[in-house]
Amino acid sequence: MKKNFIKIMLVSVAALFVTERAAAWENVGHAVIAYNAERLLDPEVKAKCRHYLKASIPFYATWMDQARSIEPYTVCDKWHSTNIDAKNKVVVGKPTTGAYHIERIRKEMANGAYKNMSDSLVKINLQYLIHMVGDHHCPVHVRWSKKSHPQYHFHLLNKGKKRSPHGFWDGAIAFQRRKWTAEKHFENMKLLSPKKAKKMQKGTAYDWTQETADVWRKYCYPAMPEGTEISKMSEEDVATVHSIVDKQVQRAAYRLAGVLTEIFKE
């Protein structure tokens, strides 16, 4: 029953219309990351998350994309990404970035402080975290200035028509995998030993964003340069895209699970 619900939910979420600007990882990708993260939680933490959310974690995976244009949540419109400076370093401490608010929420809820919050505030904070942690592992959700990094402002091609790299990488989780279920995506994710999981979960959202920026520079950009024709990609090229995406999904899922555990684990 639970697996069937998740399958139905993923199909329903994927059917929602979300603009390219709004949707890091697209709807399916966010749902997959949230589903995988929930599967990694121990029963105690999972139960507390569901208690405050009144739903599963994947249920709220794309909430921020829908809420960003609705008051009073328009304030979060720019929290879906974080700036990179001219020296390829993440910008720290800027309140209009998502990494700033991930760390703010982690600090405000740490050491049992969530118990002093209203249930509604805990819920909204969880909804932010569920989405933003995923966002900051999407290679195109780091902001490169056109002035300092003009090379990253270009177009790909899809059957001869221009397509932005943002549009491609947002949907890369489901690229040539449209029929995959949430369970299939979870089975595809490499599971880590507790020791390796803790190592991956270390650091701040700024560290993770820096890592994502480096992934873009070192792997995504070389793999899909300007003018790449998506419809004519070789099996090797597709495999390269999948290897990049699979690693980012793994990182996002483990880190989201880690953040939720640090908040709720007694």
Task: Identify the residue ranges that each predicted region occupies.
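Bacterial Sec-dependent N-terminal signal peptides
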Residues: 1-27
